[in-house]
Amino acid sequence: MNINDFDFDLPEELIAQTPLEKRSESRLLILDPKTEELEDRHFYDIIDELEAGDALVLNNTRVLPARLHGERAETGGHIELLLLKDMGENRWETLAKPARKMKVGEEVVFGDGRLKAVVVEILEHGGRIVEFKYDGIFLEILESLGEMPLPPYIHEQLEDQERYQTVFAKENGSAAAPTAGLHYTPELLEKIADKGVKIVELTLHVGLGTFRPVSVDNVDEHHMHSEFYRLTEEAAAQLRAVKASGHKIFASGTTSIRTLETIGSKFDGDIQADSGWTDIFIKPGYEWKVVDAFNTNFHLPKSTLVMLVAAFAGRDFVLEAYQHAIDEKYRFFSFGDAMFVRSKNK
């Protein structure tokens, strides 16, 4: 497979720069892989796609205010640090700007000096492992000093930081939001639960690799970044019961999909409690283990996320749906509109 098989022309004005005032009023394009029909709806209509006894799986990760601005202790020069991965023992994998200034042993001071970082290792791809020094609670210091790391294609300032969090976000650790979940409101989730749908949560901490472009022409040569995931015993038991009863598992977003399919691949289609790091790459030809249907946003051309959707619904149909969305002026990417991909077995 060639990377250009997943390309399309996207007018820049369709890239949403700000979220809608009301989350669930975004548009929803419904894709039916069986009939290859498309339907224009609104996100609050997603309740019509769910039936009593089904499960809706949400990713409860919370985005960290992971962008820090500091000064080199030695010279006072400005340094921007972006936290990517918690390595434990106060050490984080980071991206630094300007990176060339950040040599091993270099110290950076943030804010009033409550937080300091020392470079302990330089990584092959140019990242830096830093060790933080501080008094107090790290997350509280980060909340007061850090900024939300919005995606590179969003150029507007976000007035309300919570609009880049889902309403069910609780597990700190992501460098980016699981954007498919941004459309849900407490009221919509309550209506879905009242219908008899089980709402099940898992955790996958989204890394910035989600925005990293594929750099090879041959898709099979691409290696995914790894991300931490967790599915609890209670959640796994709920999902097993849904499957056993013949009902469907609906995943909200590619992060929920990648978690469930990682576990399904690991346990031969069974759903077990598990945690660890996943670098699963779902592309056309993949054999699905767990997920029956899902909602997701509209993704970047030539991205692994477009490939994931194509693996489920077929490349030609997905590109047809994307062209329809462009023609109908749907809003794209993190703050944009959504699609719902129905089960192939419905």
Curated annotation (Swiss-Prot):
GO terms for molecular function: S-adenosylmethionine:tRNA ribosyltransferase-isomerase activity. Its main location: cytoplasm. Pathway: tRNA modification; tRNA-queuosine biosynthesis. The keyword DNA repair does not apply. Keywords: Cytoplasm, Queuosine biosynthesis, S-adenosyl-L-methionine, Transferase. Pfam families: Queuosine_synth. It is found in: Cytoplasm. GO terms for biological process: queuosine biosynthetic process; tRNA wobble guanine modification. The keyword S-adenosyl-L-methionine applies. Its EC number is 2.4.99.17. Transfers and isomerizes the ribose moiety from AdoMet to the 7-aminomethyl group of 7-deazaguanine (preQ1-tRNA) to give epoxyqueuosine (oQ-tRNA). Monomer. Belongs to the QueA family. HAMAP family: QueA. PANTHER family: S-ADENOSYLMETHIONINE:TRNA RIBOSYLTRANSFERASE-ISOMERASE. This is S-adenosylmethionine:tRNA ribosyltransferase-isomerase. It comes from Lactococcus lactis subsp. cremoris (strain MG1363).
